[in-house]
């Protein structure tokens, strides 16, 4: 009986650790999806910019709290894109779009990998829960037999 209690404690601890890991992976997955959506929006904006025939089109520049300033795009043939670690480079619109498409593929791979890891964790969580249930049933059967 004491051995069953120790095993249940061990399983409960493992369950909590796995749940915490799954929660972290789920948060990472959410962040990856948000970042991917942002990159998709930028890519779509650049693709739409290519379709505009005006040389210096007017735009609204967000300044925060739902407020905007009117502005003009001075150079609609080039964009400055972040390349990571706080660095940005100027690229032609087509090069910027190509760069963003590569980044989207990287996000897709990271999302797929994270989803796989999360599925494995959830599978392991289910196994631990089933094992704990078996131990509890065994324990209750043993205590039932003893009480007879």
Swiss-Prot record:
NCBIfam families assigned to the protein according to its UniProt record, in alphabetical order: prefoldin subunit alpha
Keywords: Chaperone, Cytoplasm
Subcellular localization, as worded in the UniProt entry: Cytoplasm
Lineage top rank: taxon: Archaea
GO CC annotation: cytoplasm; prefoldin complex
Biological function: Molecular chaperone capable of stabilizing a range of proteins. Seems to fulfill an ATP-independent, HSP70-like function in archaeal de novo protein folding.
Protein name: Prefoldin subunit alpha
Stated family: Belongs to the prefoldin subunit alpha family.
Pfam families reported in the protein's UniProt record: Prefoldin
Chief site of localization: cytoplasm
MF terms (GO), sorted A to Z: unfolded protein binding
Gene3D superfamilies, per the entry: 1.10.287.370
Subunit composition and interactions: Heterohexamer of two alpha and four beta subunits.
GO biological process: protein folding
């Amino acid at each position: 009986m004491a051995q069953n209690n120790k095993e249940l404690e061990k399983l409960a601890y493992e369950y909590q650790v796995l749940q915490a890991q799954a929660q972290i992976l789920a948060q990472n997955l959410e962040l990856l999806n948000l970042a991917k959506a942002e990159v998709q929006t930028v890519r779509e904006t650049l693709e739409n910019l290519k379709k505009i025939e005006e040389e210096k089109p007017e735009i609204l520049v967000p300044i925060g709290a739902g407020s905007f300033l009117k502005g003009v795009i001075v150079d609609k043939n080039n964009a400055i894109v972040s390349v990571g670690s706080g660095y940005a480079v100027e690229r032609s619109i087509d090069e910027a779009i190509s760069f963003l498409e590569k980044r989207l593929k990287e996000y897709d791979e990271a999302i797929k990998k994270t989803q796989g890891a999360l599925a494995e964790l959830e599978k392991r969580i289910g196994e631990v829960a089933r094992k704990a249930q078996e131990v509890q049933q065994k324990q209750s059967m043993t205590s039932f037999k003893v009480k007879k």
